[in-house]
Amino acid sequence: MPKAMQAMERLGVPKRIVGFVMPTGYSFNLDGSMIFLAVSSVFIAQAAEATTGQHMGLGQQLTMMLAFMVTSKGLAGVPRASILVLLATMNTFLPANLGAMGVAILLGIDALMDMGRSAVNLMGNCLATVVIARWEGEFDDNRARVFGTPAEAELDLRSGDVAFAEAVRQGD
């Protein structure tokens, strides 16, 4: 998170907005985790239907999505936390340990899926930071234009921000 926060400041988002939105986003803006929960739950429900013949109706699926929206707010910032929320919620909606068996199928690829969830969560938080800075009228368009170019270090030196200029030169 510190590297992402520094990158958002270098992009032109004020430090006070970065300091509020990024940490808050890691608790409440978990786009990647919600996408995983939605797709995985439908996969497990379809696998359970093939096994038991019991169809999960639209109303039950919508109720399950609402449950995921509530339970995902308590996700910890640790690897593979989403799989535990998936397990707990699926056991509520599916009979006789079918949820656990479905989650067991996903465990084989969860390490890769977790990297994808983390990347989507990070991109969502960075996007939210930029959107809020623009909304507040405090986004620095000039800084964004030179972000990641050699001109960024020159702009930092002219504004007296030696630390950012050094970070640009080192490639951080």
PLM regions: where:
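Membrane-water interface at loop-to-transmembrane-helix junctions
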Residues: 16-30
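Transmembrane alpha-helical segments and their short flanking loops
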Residues: 38-172
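Internal, well-ordered alpha-helical scaffold/interface segments
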Residues: 2, 6, 19-22, 42
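Short helical (or helix-break) motifs at transmembrane helix termini and adjacent helical loops
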Residues: 1-8, 114, 125
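Selected transmembrane alpha-helices and immediately adjacent juxtamembrane segments
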Residues: 7-10, 142
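Conserved helix-loop functional segments at active or binding sites
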Residues: 10, 27-30, 50, 92
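Transmembrane alpha-helical segments and their cytosolic interface motifs
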Residues: 32-35
